[in-house]
Structure formats: C-alpha cells, structure tokens
C-alpha cells in the first residue's frame, strides 16, 4: 500500500521578534512571501520526502476572506484563527491537516528530518532544554577564564618583555574585539536552538559543513591535550619528592617527557571522562558550582604574592623591557594571539547559546568575558611580576610557582585549584565542539560520549608537552597558527547569516538531503564557501612555514600577514564569500523572474 501527502507553508519576510502569534487576517500591507511544498511518500518498506521552494511573491490582504499572492488569489484552506503567523514569520495551520502532527514554531516537523543528519544531540533544543540563564552563561565564562592557560598567556606577555599594564591592556582590547563576533555567532543558536555543526550547514552545505566542524574539532583536540597535560602536572606536584627524583622522572628523548609525568597526564585524562560522560547538564552544574571556588582560590594566590612582595607598588614595579618600536612589533601578534585564545569558542558558541533562555540571557552572560579576562589577567600579570622580586626571576608557569612555594597546605590547595580550573575550562571549551563535530559526521554511530572519547584520544596525539615548552611556541606557533583556520570559517558563517540570509534559516532544510533543499547546493557542498576558506588560509601559509623553520626566507609582507592571521583570514574569506554568493544570487534572481510561479 502506498500513501502520499502534500502540504504547503508560506514563509513571510517578517522580522521574527516583531510578531507573536497572529491570525492571517492581521496582515495589513503587502509583504514578501515564499511558498514551500513538502511532499512525502510512504509504502510498507520505504519512506521518503522532500521540501522545495515553489515560488517567491507578494502577499496582500484584500478582505477578511480574500488574499492576493502575486497575480493569483486564494482563500484560506482553514478559516479564521486556524491559520497562525508564528514568531519566525511562517503562516501555517495550527495542526497539519494532512498528517495530524504538530508543526514547530519555526515551520518544520522533526519527523521529516533525515535520520542520517540528526540525533538527540543535533536536534534543535526544545523550550524545556533551554535552562541557561545569564548567570549560568556568566558562570560558564568564569569557569573558562580561570585556568592555567589564561594565567600562562598573561604571564607570557610579561615574560616576552611587556610591562604589567601593557599586558592587561593587550588582553582586554583583544577580548572587547572578540565580544562582537561572539555575540553575533551566538544569536542563531539561541533563536533557532541549533548547534554549530548545524549552523555551518547553512553556509558550507549539508555535507560541506564537515569541513569547518572538523577543523574546529582538530583545534579543540589540541587544546584538550594542553589542558589535560596541565592537570597532570598538578598530580605530579602532589607526588613525594623521592618519587619525583627517581629514574622514572628522567626525560625519554623519543617521548619528549618523562614516564612519570606522562603517567600523571594519563591519570587526569581518565578522570575527566567521568564528567564528560554525563553530557551538557553535568557540564553546566560543574561550571556553576566551581565558579565561586575558583574565585576564592585565585584571591588567595593574589593575597600571598601581595604580602610576600610588599604590596602592589613592588608587585607591579617590573617595567617594560621593550622600546616603543619593539612594543608595537610585539603588540599586534600578541593581540592576534589573545583573540585566537577564545576564537575557538567564538566559533562554536551556538553549542552553548542554544540552551539559553533568551537572547538577553546569552548577551548579558557573555559581556562578562572581557571583564573576567581583565580581572584574571591582572592576577596573572601581578603574581608573575611579583616573582621577580620574591624569587629573583620571572616565573610565568603557575604550576612551577606553586612548586617553589612548597608546603603541604599550599600543595593540596594547588591540586584542588589547578584540577578544578582545568576541568571547568577543558570540558566546556575543548570537548563540546569536537564531540558535536563527530556526531555531525556520523549521527548513527557517534553519540556525545563517543565523540568526547575520541577527542580525548586525539588530545594525546598532539603531544601537548611540546607545545608548552616555551612562551614563544605557545603564543606564536600554536595560538596564531590555528587562527588561520578559524578566522576564515568565522568570516564565512557571519557574512552568510547576516548579509546573505538576513538571519532567516529554513530549519527543515538544514536536516534534509533533498537535492531541492535550500542548503544542498552542489551535491551537499557549497563551492563558494570552500573557495573562500582556501582564499583566507593561503596568504597565512608562508608566514607559518617560516615560523616553524620550514622556510628560511620570506617577504616581510608575509610576516605581517601571519602576525595578524586572524584579521586577514577573517576579512579575506568573508569578502570573497560575499562576492561569490552575491553574484550567484543575482543569477538566480534573473532566472526566477523569467519563470512562472507554480500556484
């Protein structure tokens, strides 16, 4: 037995926040509309469906029972308030007349999602899942900011020659700049309840979305390894002195570290998986309850350095070692590195904002980023500067500093603080995005837990102990290097969502493999996005190869481009994408204007 059904939905170009639920009769003037048809076929062994845009036209109310669409007229299939205008600007029946199933406020039916493109971790969030208040979002950022890498980044700027105030100014400036793309990228996550991998489908294509999500996942795996290594160092700090002086603590040349330190790394690696396995709710609770503890422990460290150094006057007496010209030469790559520090989260922030109660909650919660970064940077810079007075040399690594302080109580507090700070940062910042990327790659096989496990395994492959061997390799090779990958992705996604699609997404088509789907493009790939991505990366490659000593001599222009990799790659990729898509849009408009609407 074979059955089929056809349903039509009108998508109006109205701002989603200007209208709540109104009847069709509330329309007062001419507006643009898109007519979509959804056709499904079902027999005893197979079910298939597709959704396509039939036509775009004007809709104008003529009377209470008569409406004009382009050159055609119609009367509502269901009278009165049975036709409603949802917040996303979709005219639809309250219930699907054909199937009897409830249609979502954004005009889609989850039962029509292609099973190869969705599972429980990829579906749009429901109202009951949206539990993140502004306080939860702020707590998330406190947990992310208060950590060893943030402290180490601030200390690295002093270590490279900056004065304390120059280091803080660099960090705060970078995070104020970052706040703009952070809030802009979070908006579709909250509005539509979709994660970063699903949002990427709108610009890169249904299958092409694997490219940006896997690149983001790769960076996340590297960061996961770095954070886990730091947590392992905290365990190493707890070990008795005679064990740390044993033969097991000798570095193996082929490994790049000692068997003892590597074992501590693996122990912490295993401990994190217990929390990761609980999913997003476990992460939210961890961040919320850890925030006050981390603030208290950070305050204790600042108080200790204040007393030991003899006050802020002595703590902050370390002046800049740079001339004016040398400072500006260091400032711009340092600014890029600091923006790159959280550029990973700026890209996949929809993974978190999709759980926010409202746009207000996500915006207010994220404004805390530059504030928290400024405060914690002050702690990091002040304590690092004080070490030159207390110990006679600058110690930018907090784990090394805590080892120098000594004492059982200090050691225990250090273990708790470093472990908690590492867990809150690592799990939220470096597990969620790679895990979701792997789920998006193969929803039938990967769950969030399985994706997190593979992320952890790849974190070992990155050999984080080598990335942390010096301030220069951490700032110039790692942070700036990966910004060349993330910058163009961010530029493409933001240009597509705000300039090309005007914040309007067809959620049903984001989960459809139909060739007529809006985001199927060419066999599931948007060639324009791929070309723009390559265009954004290529100019940075020579500078990166020079930095890792693969190229001996390059033009000074390539050095400047690499030092500002995030800005150049973001702007170039976004501009190239806008040019290509604008030209394609004009061609499509000319084709559609010569055809007749199918009504």
Swiss-Prot record:
Annotated InterPro entries: Pur-cyt_permease, Uracil/uridine/allantoin_perm
Consequence recorded when altering residue 227 to K: Reduces uracil, guanine and adenine transport activity 10-fold
GO CC, any one term: chloroplast membrane
Tissues expressed in: Expressed in roots, leaves, stems, flowers, siliques and seeds.
Outcome when changing residue 145 to A: Reduces guanine and adenine transport activity 2-fold
Pfam families, per the entry: Transp_cyt_pur
Protein name: Purine-uracil permease NCS1
């Amino acid at each position: 037995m074979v059955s089929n059904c056809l349903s039509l939905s009108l998508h109006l170009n109205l701002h989603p926040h200007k209208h709540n639920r109104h009847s069709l009769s509330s329309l007062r003037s001419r507006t643009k509309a898109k007519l979509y048809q959804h056709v499904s076929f079902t027999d005893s062994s197979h079910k298939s469906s597709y959704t396509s845009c039939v036509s775009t036209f004007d809709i104008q109310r003529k009377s209470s029972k008569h409406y004009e669409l382009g050159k055609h007229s119609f009367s509502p299939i269901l009278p009165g308030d049975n036709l409603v205008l949802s917040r996303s600007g979709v005219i639809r029946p309250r219930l699907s007349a054909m199937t009897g199933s409830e249609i979502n406020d954004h005009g889609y039916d989850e039962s029509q999602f292609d099973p190869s493109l969705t599972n429980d971790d990829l579906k749009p969030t429901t109202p009951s899942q949206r539990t993140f208040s502004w306080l939860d979002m702020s707590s998330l950022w406190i947990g992310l900011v208060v950590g060893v890498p943030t402290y180490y980044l601030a200390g690295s700027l002093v270590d490279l020659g900056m004065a304390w105030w120059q280091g803080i100014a660099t960090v705060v400036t970078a995070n104020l700049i970052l706040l703009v793309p952070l809030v802009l990228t979070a908006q579709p996550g909250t509005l539509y309840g979709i994660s970063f991998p699903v949002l990427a489908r709108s610009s890169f294509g249904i299958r092409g979305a694997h490219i940006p999500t896997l690149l983001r996942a790769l960076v996340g795996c590297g960061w996961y390894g770095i954070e886990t290594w730091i947590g392992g160092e905290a365990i190493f700090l707890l070990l008795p002195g005679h064990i740390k002086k044993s033969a097991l603590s000798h570095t193996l040349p082929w490994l790049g570290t000692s068997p003892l330190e590597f074992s501590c790394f693996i122990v912490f690696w295993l401990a994190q998986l217990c929390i990761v396995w609980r999913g997003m709710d476990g992460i939210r609770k961890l961040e919320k309850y850890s925030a006050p503890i981390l603030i208290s422990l950070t305050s204790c460290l600042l108080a200790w350095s204040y007393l030991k150094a003899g006050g802020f006057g002595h703590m902050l007496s370390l002046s800049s070692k740079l001339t004016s010209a040398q400072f500006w030469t260091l400032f711009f790559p340092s600014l890029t590195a600091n923006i790159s520090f959280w550029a990973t989260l700026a890209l996949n922030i929809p993974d978190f904002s999709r759980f926010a109660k409202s746009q207000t909650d996500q915006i207010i919660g994220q404004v805390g980023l530059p504030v928290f970064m400024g405060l914690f940077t002050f702690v990091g810079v002040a304590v690092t500067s004080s070490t030159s007075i207390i110990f006679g040399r600058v110690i930018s690594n907090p784990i090394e500093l805590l080892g120098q302080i000594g004492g059982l109580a200090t050691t225990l507090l250090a273990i708790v603080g470093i472990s908690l700070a590492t867990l809150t940062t690592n799990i939220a910042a470096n597990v969620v995005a790679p895990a979701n990327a792997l789920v998006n790659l193969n929803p039938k096989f990967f769950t969030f837990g399985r994706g997190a496990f593979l992320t952890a395994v790849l974190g070992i492959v990155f050999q984080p102990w080598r990335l942390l061997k010096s301030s220069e390799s951490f700032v110039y090779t790692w942070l700036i290097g990966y910004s060349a990958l993330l910058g163009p992705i961010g530029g493409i996604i933001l240009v597509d969502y705000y300039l090309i699609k005007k914040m309007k997404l067809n959620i049903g088509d984001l989960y459809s493999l139909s060739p007529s789907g809006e985001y199927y493009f060419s066999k599931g790939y948007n060639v324009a996005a791929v070309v723009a991505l390559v265009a954004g990366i290529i100019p940075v490659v020579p500078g990166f190869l020079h930095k890792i000593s693969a190229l001996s001599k390059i033009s000074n222009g390539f050095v400047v481009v690499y030092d500002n990799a995030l800005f150049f790659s973001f702007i170039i990729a976004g501009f190239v994408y806008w040019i290509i898509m604008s030209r394609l849009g004009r061609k499509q408009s000319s084709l559609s204007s010569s055809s007749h609407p199918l009504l």
